[in-house]
Amino acid sequence: CASQGQKCKTKSDCCNGMWCAGTRGHTCYKPK
């Protein structure tokens, strides 16, 4: 899976239930 800050296409690409979003290409991040 993708770590925080890594590129992703969907939320399922990210580790630990992190979200996938971004304006300049999606990356994984921890929701607040």
Curated annotation (Swiss-Prot):
Disulfide bonds join C1-C15, C8-C20, C14-C28. GO terms for molecular function: ion channel regulator activity; toxin activity. Keywords: Disulfide bond, Ion channel impairing toxin, Nematocyst, Neurotoxin, Proton-gated sodium channel impairing toxin, Secreted, Toxin. It is found in: Secreted; Nematocyst. Its main location: secreted. GO terms for cellular component: extracellular region; nematocyst. It comes from the Eukaryota. Negative results: has no effect on voltage-gated sodium channels. Not toxic to crabs when administered by in vivo injection (2mg/kg crab). Reversibly inhibits acid-sensing ion channels (ASIC) in rat dorsal root ganglia neurons (IC(50)=100 nM). Reversibly inhibits voltage-gated potassium channels (Kv) in rat DRG neurons (IC(50)=3.5 uM). This is Pi-phymatoxin-Pcf1a. It comes from Phymanthus crucifer (Red beaded anemone).
